[in-house]
Amino acid sequence: MHANLFNQNASKKDVFLHNLRSNNGRYKRYIKAPLRYGGGKSLAVGLIVEYIPNGVRRIISPFIGGGSVEIACATELGLEVLGFDIFDILVNFYQVLLKDKQALYNNLLSLEPTRETYNIIKQELKAHYKKECVLDPLILARDYYFNFNLSYGPGFLGWMSKIYTDKQRYLNALLKIRGFNTPSLKVECSSFEEVLLAYPNDFFYLAPLYVLENSKMFKGIYPMRNFPIHHNGFKHEVLAHMLKRHKEPFILSYNDCEFVRNAYKDFKILEPSWQYTMGQGEIRMGKNRLERGDNNHVKQSHELLIIKE
């Protein structure tokens, strides 16, 4: 770290990491990503950015999800970031946000965070998801955000959390929509196989869905616990095979389990620790966590960072 981070030689990365670090030496949560997201990396951003090579000018992310790392790299480091996801409704949200954040903000501002409104929006979103209707992209983005960010968990087509009926909390959250300014981020709908084949000469950041078998994760959650169609059957072996053949550096966030450790044993494996934002503010604890003896409601990470240098 430079002695004076604010001289001409200080990189954007150095300055960002310096500002993100708390007095106790640990990184603070990165708070500019607008979505609450299961498995989100808002507290891991500093740890991950540390390992991004200094010469990188573009980052490819096949699993944008909540986008904390991707948004930080685009907003704070000024890097070009190409984000992808297989979930078209999530991709539409980002595309609308990037195209016209003010229209999205205004539409969300017109909604009251009540259970009645939530149920109406949920049914409208569900009808689109089941192909019973086709929502305009702006309305779809509005409905997705309102349903997802105000839900317990959070979860797509989930149930409204009591703590998000607080109107001031809702208005504060919308400030992230209004203030979003990340022109070097682009988001498209595509599978990880297509993305890895399309960008063989780029640096990748990947946060794939967790391995369920023999891991601490009991059930898939994408896009929602009751129908984890993107989670169940995810091709972990295919991803490992393709990454072993990828000739450029990458950083991979994965859950800690036997399969992952064996599949990526030839790469650098780190064991960082952070808290998940999923369920932040909730005090209920699930049956599985009670049975294994968790003594509070704060969910700790059980992830690995896998690095190809």
Regions found by a protein language model. Name each.
Residues H2-V45, N54, K101-I221, F234-K235, ...:
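SAM-dependent nucleic-acid methyltransferase catalytic core
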Residues E50, R57-K126, D166-K167:
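SAM cofactor-binding core of SAM-dependent methyltransferases
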Residues S61-F63, F84-D85, E188-S190, L206-P208, ...:
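Short His-Asn-centered micro-motif
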Residues G65-G66, A173-L174, Y254-E258:
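Short, polar loop motifs at secondary-structure junctions
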Residues S68-A72, L90-N92, G153-F156, L212-S215, ...:
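Short catalytic/ligand-binding loop motif for oxyanion handling, primarily in non-cytosolic enzymes
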Residues C73-E76, F180, L197-Y199, F259-D266:
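Short loop/helix-cap segments at secondary-structure boundaries that form the rim of catalytic
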Residues I229-E309:
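Long, positively charged, glycine-interspersed low-complexity recognition regions
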